[in-house]
Amino acid sequence: MKKILEVKDICKTYQAQNGEIEALKNISFDVKEGDYISIIGPSGCGKSTLLSIISGLEPKTSGEIHIEGKIGYMLQKDNLLEWRTIYKNVLLGLEIQKDKTQENIEYTENLLKKYGLYEFKDKYPTQLSGGMRQRAALIRTLAVRPKILLLDEAFSALDYQTRLMVTEDIFKILKAENIT
């Protein structure tokens, strides 16, 4: 399988009142197409920082990252905009990237249909269950057609039973859409 993400010697330090804090030190790993990996550790150990660096949202202090293709990043909270319908929410990434072509709109509408949210497209986020909101957030992330998907505790706000169900749904979606 082809290597699609290479992380080499990533370091991240922050300035604090009493000196530097080393959040990440010499983190290295590769991800091949089709891999599913988990980054596990206690709160505050730098998992979210690492994902933010990989996605380009936060600068690294040193090291190298090589990415083959687009990255989709789904944060802990669904970050759906409450004043926008589900349909407008799932198109947001395409709007931001100025890539709202007819082909991409149709692709996104198909994702809504395929994953059971099309009939809720005119609803607002407050009208959906937690699991449905997470699926909408995932569809918004998938709409930009990422090759790599980063999930930062994307289901931590859900109860245990819903989390299991949504995790299983998402794994099926990633497999069906051929996303790493």
Model feature map: region roles:
Residues I40-P42:
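The feature captures the beta-strand-to-loop junction immediately N-terminal to the Walker
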Residues Y87-E95, I105:
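Short helical segment in ABC ATPase nucleotide-binding domains corresponding to the A-loop/adjacent helical element
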Residues S55:
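Helix-to-loop junction immediately C-terminal to a conserved catalytic motif
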Residues L149-D152:
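Catalytic Walker B motif of ABC-type/P-loop ATPase nucleotide-binding domains
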